[in-house]
Each structure stands twice: as structure tokens, then as C-alpha cells.
A protein has these predicted regions:
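A short, basic/flexible loop-to-alpha-helix module at the beginning of a structural domain
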Residues: 1
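Vicinal oxygen chelate
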Residues: 4, 14-17, 77-97
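Short, structured motif recognition centered on aromatic/hydrophobic residues
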Residues: 6, 59, 71-74
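Short aromatic/hydrophobic contact patches that present stacked aromatics
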Residues: 8-10, 48, 76-78
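Core segments of cupin and vicinal oxygen chelate
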Residues: 11-56
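Short helix/strand-bridging catalytic loops that position acidic/His residues to coordinate divalent metals
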Residues: 37, 75-76
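Short, charged/polar surface micro-motifs in flexible loops or helix N-caps
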Residues: 54-56, 68, 84-87
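Short beta-strand/turn micro-motifs at beta-sheet edges
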Residues: 62-67
Length: 97
């Protein structure tokens, strides 16, 4: 099986400005991109951040999380793999967990 590396994580947040201040001010991430994107929930603000110029984004903040809707704030956890065969090998191992 080939190498698997972390790619990025996305959070659906209520207050995107506050979360941007947290990730940039406290954790030292840099905003690499921003803007509204069309989603199944409508057009939402996004902020892409990274700790390294080699990565467009490592932490993605998606605004528009409703206060009254209880759901998981982690939208995705993404990894990179060397090839599709690595993904298939990982898929075969899932029942072990």
C-alpha cells in the first residue's frame, strides 16, 4: 500500500470572521483564498487557510452554519494517496476497524 498523507479539513462555522481570527491569529495560519461558493445550503462564504505556501489550503472554514440545526461541524477530512490502488487497499482494510 502506498503512502497516505493528510490533505485538509473543513469546518462549517457560525461566525466565520471569529473563526478566521482564531486560526490566523492564534494558530498562525495564513489566508490563501476566500470567497462565496455555491453549496447545497446556498451561497456561503469560505476562507481557505494554510501553514505552508506549498498547500493552497489545510483548514477550510465554511460560513453559514445555522444556530438552530444540531449537526457535526466537521464537513470533511481529506487525505492524499499515491494512487487509486492505495485507496482500494485502504478500503479493503476498513472492516478491521
Amino acid at each position: 500500500m502506498g503512502a497516505i498523507t493528510f490533505s485538509h479539513i473543513g469546518f462549517h462555522v457560525r461566525d466565520i470572521e471569529k473563526m478566521e481570527r482564531f486560526y490566523t491569529g492564534l494558530l498562525g495560519l495564513t489566508v490563501t483564498d476566500r470567497g462565496p461558493l455555491d453549496t447545497p445550503l446556498g451561497r456561503l462564504p469560505f476562507v481557505f487557510t494554510s501553514s505552508t505556501p506549498q498547500e493552497h489550503h489545510q483548514v477550510v472554514l465554511a460560513g453559514g452554519r445555522p444556530d438552530h440545526v444540531p449537526f457535526n461541524v466537521i464537513n470533511q477530512l481529506s487525505f492524499r494517496m499515491e494512487d487509486f490502488a492505495t485507496l482500494r487497499a485502504l478500503q479493503r482494510r476498513l472492516p478491521e476497524f
